[in-house]
């Protein structure tokens, strides 16, 4: 039996889609030196090659893909978006605006200089900034712009072409810039990170290991009684001196949970909870061969929970003000916008931040009730909320504004982005509403993006050879300029206008470009994870601004003549 693969793929859109996805994902795993191509560029390259062979796909799949992607981007940004926008993220907001705004203006200027259409210009902006949200926003606005169908088809093809030609240029140039730009300025990045660490009492180790607390029991002997000198536990400050706290005491056969007024007596058996290294550093008066193994004394349920910051008595406060250790709890991680932050006593908590806390189950529950709620560990998605807000986003996208003879619509991209932000924000405030497991959110976002990339590549593939010959050299120059010039402008603004610490500034710049590989290089250069503070500050707002930039470039273009 002979099977004509071309006819088979042309006759089955679903099969074609998944063949493109599978081949593209395989290609995306290849590395060029230390740079991995990535899923997006892999799927785009495969779809462009198949598009040259005149394979095509139903545009409805493309539309659904971009809608799912941009909605999930909003859901991820929602918990921290408003806190960054309205409160302590002024510098980060300004940096993101400078980065995106300068890139938009430069792209518009180069597009007019080289005589490109809006499709090539917007695609070049999206590729140079390695930003799919720009591509999504521009494509959606073009479809709702009301231009003639032949012009629309050409613009959409050129949009994909511009993105494909400049994506790798943007990615490689930014990674090279992240490696060498810190060396061209007079302040050493490692020194800047250490300065912040000294000022804020941070651990500068980017590879800090996290251990769970353990419980061990000791019998109080004369050395320990002498060491306490008759002071109660509150006066002794056991945790400050040892890194452990006393969870239980057995006295005269009676097991009790001590309060701050308890005084240790000869023969007491005490259960100490702390990290392994804290136990190893204990004064010999605690240990000295007096460790005991009492099942009841050691029978404690140590749990690790992720607590979402929500309550007003925690939002806006510094981490140190929570006094977790005073309540017998240990902080393992601080996560903001899926970025692990340095454990900094001076970090101001935002609504939606996640604290990973370990300790006795009762104590952790008490702390969680005080500052927010324990994150749900269910793997079930609230599909009702997901669908409801998706519908709201589509309805918002239908809104159109009319100014004399000129009209423009918000578009599906902006509408879905806003609806996603609201869902994410409400989820951060109401533990049982709109829950979407992070794995499910990542899967839907990634799948939507891959479907979108497959669609744009297949639709643009037939014209890539002609386009590459006509504008290839111009695209190379424009891609480099749009990729690197905004980074330099943003650095000058942050360093000499905002006067930011350089470690935080470079992290914030990579966040404004939403480029995780470049962020890793900055952290390696600083030999610290402190730049992650800046990265998290700009990342959420930049994702939103980049989507709006894709919409704005299409709206502004006709007015430039």
From Swiss-Prot:
HAMAP family: YbjL (MF_01015). PANTHER family: K(+)_H(+) ANTIPORTER SUBUNIT KHTT, TRANSPORT PROTEIN YBJL-RELATED. Pfam families: Asp-Al_Ex (PF06826), TrkA_C (PF02080). InterPro entries: AAE_transporter, RCK_C, RCK_C_sf, Transp_YbjL_put, YidE_YbjL. Its main location: membrane. Residues 200-288, 292-373 form the RCK C-terminal domain. GO terms for cellular component: plasma membrane. This is Putative transport protein YbjL.
């Amino acid at each position: 039996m002979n099977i004509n693969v071309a006819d088979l793929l042309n006759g089955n859109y679903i099969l074609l889609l998944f063949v493109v996805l599978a081949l593209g994902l395989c290609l995306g795993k290849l590395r060029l030196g230390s740079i991995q191509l990535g899923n997006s560029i892999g799927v785009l390259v495969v779809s462009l090659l198949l598009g040259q062979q005149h394979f095509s796909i139903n545009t409805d799949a493309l539309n659904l893909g971009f809608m799912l992607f941009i909605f999930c981007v909003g859901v991820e940004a929602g918990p921290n978006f408003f806190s960054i926008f309205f409160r302590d993220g002024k510098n980060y907001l300004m940096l993101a605006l400078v980065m995106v705004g300068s890139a938009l203006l430069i792209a518009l200027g180069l597009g007019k200089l080289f005589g490109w259409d809006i499709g090539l210009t917007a695609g070049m902006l999206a590729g140079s900034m390695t930003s799919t949200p720009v591509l999504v926003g521009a494509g959606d606005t073009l479809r709702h712009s009301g231009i003639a169908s032949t012009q629309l088809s050409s613009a959409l093809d050129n949009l994909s072409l511009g993105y494909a030609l400049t994506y790798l240029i943007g990615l490689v140039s930014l990674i090279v810039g992240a490696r060498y730009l810190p060396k061209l300025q007079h302040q050493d990045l490692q020194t800047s990170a250490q300065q912040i660490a000294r000022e804020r009492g941070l651990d500068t180790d980017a590879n800090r290991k996290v251990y769970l607390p353990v419980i061990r029991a000791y019998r109080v002997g004369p050395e320990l009684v002498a060491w306490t000198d008759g002071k109660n536990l509150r006066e002794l400050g056991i945790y400050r001196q040892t890194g452990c706290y006393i969870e239980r005491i057995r006295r005269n056969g009676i097991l009790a949970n001590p309060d701050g007024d308890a005084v240790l007596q000869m023969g007491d058996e005490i259960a100490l909870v702390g990290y392994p290294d804290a136990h190893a550093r204990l004064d010999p008066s605690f240990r000295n061969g007096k460790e005991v193994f009492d099942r009841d004394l050691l029978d404690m349920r140590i749990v690790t929970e992720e607590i979402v910051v929500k309550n007003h008595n925690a939002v806006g406060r510094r981490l140190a003000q929570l006094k977790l250790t005073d309540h017998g709890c240990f902080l393992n991680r601080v996560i903001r916008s899926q970025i692990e932050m340095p454990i900094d006593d001076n970090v101001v908590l935002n609504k939606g931040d996640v604290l990973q806390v370990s300790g006795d189950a009762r104590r952790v529950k008490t702390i969680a009730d005080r500052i927010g709620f324990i994150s749900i560990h269910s793997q079930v998605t609230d599909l009702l909320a997901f669908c409801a807000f998706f519908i709201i986003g589509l309805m918002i996208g239908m809104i159109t504004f009319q100014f004399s003879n000129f009209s423009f619509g918000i578009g599906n991209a902006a509408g879905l982005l806003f609806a996603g932000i609201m869902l994410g924000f409400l989820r951060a405030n109401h533990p049982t509403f709109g829950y979407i497991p992070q794995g499910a959110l990542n899967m839907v976002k990634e799948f939507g993006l891959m479907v979108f990339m497959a669609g744009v590549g297949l639709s643009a593939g037939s014209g890539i050879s002609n386009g590459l010959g006509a504008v290839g050299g111009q695209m190379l120059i424009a891609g480099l300029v749009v990729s690197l010039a905004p980074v330099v402008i943003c650095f000058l603004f942050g360093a000499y206008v905002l006067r930011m610490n350089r470690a935080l500034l470079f992290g914030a710049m990579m966040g404004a470009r939403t480029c995780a590989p470049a962020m890793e290089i900055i952290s390696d250069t600083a030999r610290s994870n402190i730049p992650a503070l800046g990265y998290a500050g700009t990342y959420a707002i930049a994702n939103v601004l980049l989507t709006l930039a894709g919409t704005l470039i299409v709206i502004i273009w006709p007015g430039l003549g």
